[in-house]
């Protein structure tokens, strides 16, 4: 279904032509399901139709009425449980190696056995000793920069985050890795999340909480004109 078809289906739902369920209509959800949220339609369409936002609103209303599945919650809350799950990396990674476990996981969670899970690592970016300078140091530095490390690069592809840190430091920058508690720069302070996983599951209110937390943390740096560097386009575009 093309963007125009999805938009027409949404119009039918809003006008009541798909029944009394409105935005919580299963037919509307099916029409929106294949939208990947790339925002290409908003960028390229002459009328600026933002289908990605419409999909999120549809998910929000549908899930508010029909409830969230275990699959929804596993995706949405990944940033919150990733730190704990990483400790069990050896066990969790068996799912990708044993087909029977993949099928069992699909039965329990709803996540397809035909797709591999991200590889967990017991050692990741957020529990490494070297994570840049403190907030106070970067605010007074000659060449300051703030690095926003997202959940996926922090836990699943730590080499990307480590490489970004090394490149910035090699360029002469004082790098601060933003965290929930800005009193230091240790791993236990908690990493920041843009809320993208919650949006993908229709949990708009939870996504808003994380977005506010991220913006409030980064605001002091932005007000000083300090550059904020991110690694994951989806996370940056969510802001």
PLM segments and residue spans:
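Mobile "lid/hinge" segments at catalytic clefts and subdomain interfaces of large enzymes
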Residues: 1-18
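Iron-sulfur-cluster electron-transfer modules
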Residues: 15-193, 198-239
């Amino acid at each position: 279904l093309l963007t125009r078809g999805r938009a027409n289906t949404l119009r039918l739902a809003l006008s009541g032509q798909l029944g009394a369920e409105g935005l919580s209509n299963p037919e509307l959800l099916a029409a929106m399901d294949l939208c990947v949220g790339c925002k290409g339609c908003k960028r390229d369409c002459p009328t600026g139709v933002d289908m990605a936002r419409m999909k999120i609103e549809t998910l929000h209303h549908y899930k508010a009425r029909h409830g969230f599945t275990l699959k929804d919650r596993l995706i949405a809350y990944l940033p919150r449980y990733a730190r704990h799950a990483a400790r069990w990396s050896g066990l969790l990674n068996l799912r990708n190696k044993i087909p029977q476990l993949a099928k069992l996981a699909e039965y329990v969670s709803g996540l397809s056995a035909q797709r591999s899970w991200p590889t967990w690592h017991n050692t990741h970016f957020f529990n490494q000793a070297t994570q840049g300078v403190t907030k106070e140091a970067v605010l007074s530095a000659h060449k300051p920069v703030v690095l926003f490390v997202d959940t996926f690069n922090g836990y699943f592809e730590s080499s990307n985050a480590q490489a970004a840190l090394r490149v910035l430091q090699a360029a002469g920058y004082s790098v601060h890795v933003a965290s929930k508690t800005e009193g230091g720069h240790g791993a236990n302070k908690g990493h920041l999340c843009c809320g993208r996983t919650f949006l993908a599951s229709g949990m708009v209110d939870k996504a808003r909480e994380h977005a506010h937390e991220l913006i409030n943390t980064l605001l002091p740096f932005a007000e000083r004109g300090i550059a904020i560097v991110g690694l994951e386009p989806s996370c940056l575009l969510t802001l």
